[in-house]
């Protein structure tokens, strides 16, 4: 049944970059069914809030976003004016991890949301939204522990009833970019097979399922055609990519192919599991031209007893050895990690071990989190809980240390040359990220351009007649720092951004055929 009426929808995305990809897939599904995407929720008929359910703060942000969207209504609700003439949205719908994780419980406790939909609803999202606007009750998602659901891996799935996407076929992914800019996120897999004691993600994201290399490469080409210059490869655990494809070295084979995609100047892989960092993978990551010499390693702690209680492996010595081997391959390495303080049973000596590790590790960026119970996890049932006030003191201590160490790490780059992907040009300055910096996560780099520039909105004309514009890869020399941010002086343009190629949007028939190809539809 067609839902092709003129409807306007606003998408609000919270949480991680994986959620951003899910929102872009939802936008493509809705656009293929005739929905108009608007940026202002007050102008929409329906507001779709892609929620995060990872930690308490993220859950609160998601609920606040749903309440804020509800507050934009003019009192009509789903039964308001059918033509959308009234101000404010007529429907507020929750999707994403919070909706998947809590489903009916969220719907009962938050009546401001007209529907709460799980991942399995994504392929038919347009139909569900149309039903909500028509006043038809849409059952709330009933959560299931996806750890108990064994996926049909790509190796065993039946082939789709259309030719598989491949490089240079012109296949258009079911995705619509929602933000302009030269950096694009590319999801290579979904779910996780690890069972860390503190993490609830596998319970609602499910087991690890890799996308096929052809699908990933086809989407990479499409993103390049949309103006992307850097690809950030995301998943719940990127080091597991390919194990369900029957090839433990699938990522090592895929990475050089992605780096060779025309128009792409940098590929960055994030969410790496230290316990799965094989020497051969480390070498590919850090020596392949076009791959950022960058490691995003989730250490979580450095004390072996704490790590064992977390159901994780390694320790300070193992992690320092891994970093030493990485720097032997790439002396300019950028390395970031996250750590948790206050895990049940953590002692003052454990915190000292973590601090000593951080002092020796020379990381460029570190996220520090205080432990909190997540229902349904093993850690929530552990004894020897640390009082909240002590967790906060430990978090402040480690955060203060990290700020000093990462600033010193940035200072150590003064005098070095960096390659910066330009994201903005204004006022004689080009801003972007060097190879050791993940956009919006690790700080950035401000490049001073030569005098004699053009208008503030760029591109900036240099004294030598060059142009620096968004998407250009430039070389610069670091001359100063501000915290973890670098200040550099322009040297040369290394690779210019090409004009963005026109890429067709999916037609409704094509979009329908592609339903299920993406990872965001419940796998």
From Swiss-Prot:
Highest taxon of the lineage: Bacteria
UniProt family annotation: Belongs to the methylthiotransferase family. RimO subfamily.
Binding site for [4Fe-4S] cluster 2: 192, 196, 199
Cofactor(s) in the UniProt record: [4Fe-4S] cluster
Function noted in UniProt: Catalyzes the methylthiolation of an aspartic acid residue of ribosomal protein uS12.
GO cellular component, as recorded: cytosol
Keywords: 4Fe-4S, Cytoplasm, Iron, Iron-sulfur, Metal-binding, S-adenosyl-L-methionine, Transferase
Free-text remark on how the cofactor is bound: Binds 2 [4Fe-4S] clusters. One cluster is coordinated with 3 cysteines and an exchangeable S-adenosyl-L-methionine.
Keyword ATP-binding: no
An MF annotation (GO) of this entry: aspartic acid methylthiotransferase activity
Species of the source: Frankia casuarinae (strain DSM 45818 / CECT 9043 / HFP020203 / CcI3)
TRAM domain: residues covered: 411-492
Residue span, Radical SAM core domain: 178-409
EC number: 2.8.4.4
Protein name from the UniProt record: Ribosomal protein uS12 methylthiotransferase RimO
């Amino acid at each position: 049944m067609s839902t092709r009426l003129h409807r306007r929808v606003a998408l609000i995305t919270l949480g991680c970059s994986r959620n951003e990809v899910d929102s872009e897939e939802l936008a493509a599904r809705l656009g293929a069914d005739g929905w108009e995407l608007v940026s202002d929720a007050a102008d929409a008929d329906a507001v779709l809030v892609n929620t995060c359910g990872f930690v308490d703060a993220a859950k609160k942000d998601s609920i606040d976003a749903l309440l804020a969207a509800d507050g934009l209504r003019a009192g009509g609700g789903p039964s308001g004016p059918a033509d959308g003439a009234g101000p404010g949205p007529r429907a507020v719908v929750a999707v994403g991890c919070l909706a998947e994780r809590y489903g009916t419980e969220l719907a009962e406790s938050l009546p401001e949301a007209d529907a709460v939909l799980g991942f399995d609803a994504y392929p038919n999202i347009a139909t569900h939204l149309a039903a909500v606007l028509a006043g038809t009750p849409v059952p709330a998602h009933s959560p299931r522990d996806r750890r108990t659901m064994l996926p049909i891996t790509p190796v065993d799935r039946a082939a789709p009833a259309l030719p598989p996407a491949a490089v240079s076929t012109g296949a258009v992914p079911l995705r619509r970019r929602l933000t302009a800019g030269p950096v694009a996120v590319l999801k290579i897999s979904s779910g996780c097979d690890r069972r860390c004691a503190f993490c609830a993600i596998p319970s609602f994201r499910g087991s690890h399922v890799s996308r096929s290399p052809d699908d990933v490469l086809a989407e990479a080409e499409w993103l390049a055609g949309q103006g992307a210059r850097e690809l950030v490869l995301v998943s719940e655990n990127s080091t597991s990519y390919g194990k369900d494809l029957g090839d433990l070295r699938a990522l090592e084979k895929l990475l050089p192919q992605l780096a060779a995609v025309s128009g792409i100047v940098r590929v960055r892989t994030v969410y790496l599991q230290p316990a799965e960092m094989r020497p051969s993978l480390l070498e590919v990551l850090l020596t392949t031209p076009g791959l950022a010499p960058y490691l995003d390693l989730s250490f979580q702690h450095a004390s072996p007893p704490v790590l064992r209680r977390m159901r994780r492996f390694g320790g300070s010595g193992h992690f320092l050895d891994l970093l030493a081997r990485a720097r032997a391959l790439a002396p300019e390495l950028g390395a970031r990690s996250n750590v948790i303080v206050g895990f049940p049973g953590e002692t003052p000596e454990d915190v000292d071990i973590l601090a000593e590790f951080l002092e020796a590790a020379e990381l460029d960026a570190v996220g520090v989190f205080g432990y909190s119970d997540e229902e349904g996890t093993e850690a929530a049932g552990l004894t020897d809980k640390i009082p909240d006030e002590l967790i906060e003191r430990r978090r402040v201590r480690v955060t203060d240390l990290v700020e000093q160490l990462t600033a010193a790490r940035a200072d150590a780059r003064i005098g070095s040359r960096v390659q910066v992907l330009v994201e903005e040009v204004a006022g004689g300055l080009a801003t972007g990220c060097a190879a050791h910096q993940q956009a919006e996560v690790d700080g950035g780099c401000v490049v001073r351009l030569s005098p004699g520039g053009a208008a503030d909105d760029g591109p900036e004309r240099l004294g030598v007649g060059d142009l620096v514009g968004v998407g250009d890869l430039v070389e610069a020399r670091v001359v100063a720092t501000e915290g973890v941010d670098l200040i550099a002086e322009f040297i040369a343009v290394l690779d210019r951004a090409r004009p963005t190629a026109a890429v067709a949007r999916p037609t409704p028939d094509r979009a329908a055929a592609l339903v299920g190809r993406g990872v965001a539809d419940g796998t």
